[in-house]
Amino acid sequence: MNNFSNLVDALIKDEMEGTPRHELVLFLGKTPELLQAVAGFPDYDLVITGKVIGKVCFDHGIGPSLLKRLPDIINSPKSIFRSANQHQTDSVIVLTYELKGLAPIIMPIRHSQSIGRNGVFNIITSVYGKEGPDPEVKWQKQGLQLWTNPI
């Protein structure tokens, strides 16, 4: 088991015991080259906070087994879209191949975010199943698509 996986387990356990560790920052590694090339993300470390891990697991119902695979999942996206929120020019939405029920799992990611005194990072701000009409079709029609896997 790798360090990221162990930390996810520890964070979920702590949250279940009533002692959440929201302040922790978990490193997934360097920002994938694809995000740098397609979305203009800087070459910073890609991170997720303990608070987001807790929210994703307990509020969005994404299981620990998927959370532990985030470093691999982020390196093999289905598509990448600009945020539909015009005020979030520092954000992209990564559409994964993973599903929660019938809903595709997406990951909003922001670049160049300061986290306390830890430095500047690219940060996964959430992970959840996008319910409703197919978001891929909707976002393509809105002209938000930056990249899609040609396979």
Protein language model features and the residues they cover:
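Ribonuclease/tRNase effector modules and their secretory precursors
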Residues: 1-151
